[in-house]
């Protein structure tokens, strides 16, 4: 690292804080703070959506999978992109028209208010662990950049994200995500990808140096791909962090078109990461761990200045996911859990922006503390997605697609699916495939059986649901009052 590289990194970090301050000046209401006023156009929407779904796991982990498996290492990020495409094409327009703030509020609208608390707890656990995994990644990046101690690196990276997220909420996060999207595009796609391929001697040399399995589309294994689809593609359909970005769209057309563009971008990013990892395998065949491939090729193969920009791209990947997960975690904690536990609805006199700021600050400090205590990023991320998909996929998609589904069925589905997933992870291990396979099946059986065994959802509830889905004017949902009200 040279002075030029350090300057690039420092300017980038300072810019994130400056954008946080700028975003604060645009935030005057709860809608501004939580969903950027629901007024993002297609360019900003697609850029910020791509930024949040392509985090440290997609960048550093995607290159690592390419190093380990070759081109088929792209499948993890490909399934993320395919999930985003499915969400955008089939569901985003309806989601955007609901005009809610959280997934649990959608479940309340659909089922009549019977499942919000338990679904909120499950979603909170998912967003919390997602934020933790992103925050842990700061240790790796800041170690490469500054040689910082792990704890110091986590505190530094976490403090920057907490600061700009707390200042301006979703407006600050939107502005920083757009910069991060551009930095990632330039750093990874336009610089690191071609430089890595050239350094490795081109594709012909890569093919001659590596086993044929490195160029097989299914070299990673069909079962692994199937598991990725269940966890990541379905996770894209129902995660609060993703839905909260859909809520920022100006209208349903922006949500559909912008999301489709972001999903397509993810597919290109997936292939790029796998190719970079494959090139790294040619250049550095004996690395201690596949996830070291990204840092190694950046340190050893890139020229002055470019190295700093690509490391800024890695920071961008981590920060965009971290900030998105943090605001989602705080939104769920405040609006779906705290408000229900105290049983006190908000009124117009409450300073709701201040209350949501407080929750982001508290959740951010909690995330940093857990990140310092944990080490295994992969296991934490797997727990997050297993609990999310096993507990909430069926009642959410069932609510959107099956009018016979009931609140009792949704509650049973969340409880049975979530419990089954957690129990099997304790028995078979966190990284086993059985928890998500069996958990999803158990959740589906419980949802269908209990829904058919109970009275249909009240006609008035369904009528209000269908009118909201159709985009009929409806008042903004009332979020929780602040904790200090």
Predicted region positions:
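Membrane-embedded helix-loop-helix hairpins and adjacent transmembrane boundary segments
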Residues: 1-485
């Amino acid at each position: 690292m040279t002075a030029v590289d350090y300057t690039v990194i420092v300017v980038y970090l300072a810019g994130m804080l400056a954008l946080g301050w700028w975003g604060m000046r645009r935030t005057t209401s709860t809608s501004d703070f939580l969903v950027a006023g629901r007024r993002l156009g297609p360019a900003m929407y697609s850029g910020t959506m791509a930024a949040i779904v392509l985090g440290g796991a997609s960048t550093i982990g995607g290159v690592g999978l390419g190093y380990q498996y070759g081109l088929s290492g792209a499948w993890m990020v490909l399934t993320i992109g395919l999930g985003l495409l499915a969400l955008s094409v089939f569901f985003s327009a309806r989601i955007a028209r609901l005009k809610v703030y959280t997934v649990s509020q959608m479940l309340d609208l659909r089922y009549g208010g019977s499942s919000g608390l338990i679904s909120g707890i499950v979603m909170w656990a998912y967003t919390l662990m997602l934020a933790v995994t992103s925050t842990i990644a700061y240790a790796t990046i800041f170690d490469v950049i500054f040689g910082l101690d792990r704890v110091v690196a986590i505190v530094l990276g976490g403090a920057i994200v907490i600061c700009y997220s707390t200042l301006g909420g979703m407006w600050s996060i939107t502005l920083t995500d757009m910069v991060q999207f551009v930095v990632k595009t330039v750093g990874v796609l336009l610089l690191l990808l071609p430089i890595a391929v050239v350094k490795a001697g081109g594709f012909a040399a890569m093919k001659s140096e590596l086993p044929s399995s490195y160029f097989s589309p299914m070299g990673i294994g069909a079962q692994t791909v199937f598991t990725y689809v269940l966890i990541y593609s379905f996770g894209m359909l129902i995660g609060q962090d993703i839905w909260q970005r859909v809520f920022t769209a100006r209208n349903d057309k922006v949500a559909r078109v912008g999301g489709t563009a972001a999903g397509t971008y993810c597919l290109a990013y997936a292939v790029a990461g796998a190719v970079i990892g494959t090139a790294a395998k040619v250049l550095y065949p004996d690395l201690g761990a596949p996830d070291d491939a990204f840092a190694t090729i950046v340190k050893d193969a890139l020229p002055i200045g470019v190295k700093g920009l690509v490391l800024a791209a890695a920071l961008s990947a981590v920060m965009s996911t971290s900030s998105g997960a943090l605001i989602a975690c705080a939104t769920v904690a405040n609006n779906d859990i705290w408000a229900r536990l105290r049983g006190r609805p908000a009124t117009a006199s409450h300073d709701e922006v201040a209350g949501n700021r407080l929750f982001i600050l508290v959740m951010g400090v909690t995330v940093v503390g857990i990140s310092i205590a944990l080490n295994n990023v992969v296991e934490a991320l797997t727990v997050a997605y297993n609990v999310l998909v096993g507990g909430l996929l069926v009642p959410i998609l069932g609510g959107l697609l099956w009018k016979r589904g009931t609140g009792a069925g949704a509650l049973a589905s969340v409880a049975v699916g979530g419990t089954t997933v957690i129990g099997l992870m304790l028995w078979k291990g966190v990284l086993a495939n059985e928890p998500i396979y069996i958990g999803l099946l158990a959740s589906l059986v419980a949802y269908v059986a209990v829904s058919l065994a109970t009275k249909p959802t009240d006609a008035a509830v369904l009528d209000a649901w269908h009118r909201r889905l159709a985009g009929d004017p409806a008042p903004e949902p009332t979020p929780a009052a602040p904790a200090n009200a």
